[in-house]
């Protein structure tokens, strides 16, 4: 089961989130049938989104949009405070690797663009914040967003590793943030540790990667686990929701769908679930719309 562990240094100067998102990203790959680079790009976005949502309370929802002008197109993800996330990538078929090493490439094919975060607190007035893409690798772009937009110095590591058949092997990451009151000596110590820590890929490949991430972040410093919560890919779409959307089209357009198309098929962008509305379904919707 996927999970996120929240922790804080005993000094109260640093907090860290570590995540195992393997099943989440695996489910996304299966639903969208993404190829290698698209899988990694979408997976990193889902992980970043789960970190941001874990910072919220109540019934808030956080949308992340990674908007590039190159191969991937847009990547859209939505997460809630209960650990659920859904998302999609416009171009599912990007499959580019380094010839010598087989490393899956993401950044060079993201292009120029923006990292957009929309936080919906349920008040009817969502808050939107935008920062430019720095490398297109998503992890670095997320860290830049946290530092520039939320004014919280942060270190981030996110990755998705694939097996020999390009299926998700493991996915996860971490976020480390400096809290008010941290001394210069503490900051220097943590900066040095982050600079010298093994690559996120090697940590994720270790036998117990959650513990490996925590050990790499805190070293010999004491820390306290604050919480452990489950994570999952979950889409809240339903036939009823799409029926409500059809109701907004108007009688004329609905009648055309019924008479000319003999029904309509709608596919959810976030999870690829398809819903079919028969002529009888459309007749009912038309009748409901004129009541």
UniProtKB/Swiss-Prot annotation:
GO terms for cellular component: cytoplasm. One of its GO terms (biological process) is protein refolding. It is found in: Cytoplasm. Disulfide bonds join 235-237, 268-271. SUPFAM superfamilies: Hsp33 domain, HSP33 redox switch-like. Keywords: Chaperone, Cytoplasm, Disulfide bond, Redox-active center, Zinc. GO terms for molecular function: protein folding chaperone; unfolded protein binding. InterPro entries: Heat_shock_Hsp33 (IPR000397), Heat_shock_Hsp33_C (IPR016154), Heat_shock_Hsp33_N (IPR016153). Pfam families: HSP33. The keyword Cytoplasm applies. Belongs to the HSP33 family. Redox regulated molecular chaperone. Protects both thermally unfolding and oxidatively damaged proteins from irreversible aggregation. Plays an important role in the bacterial defense system toward oxidative stress. This is 33 kDa chaperonin. It comes from Streptococcus agalactiae serotype Ia (strain ATCC 27591 / A909 / CDC SS700).
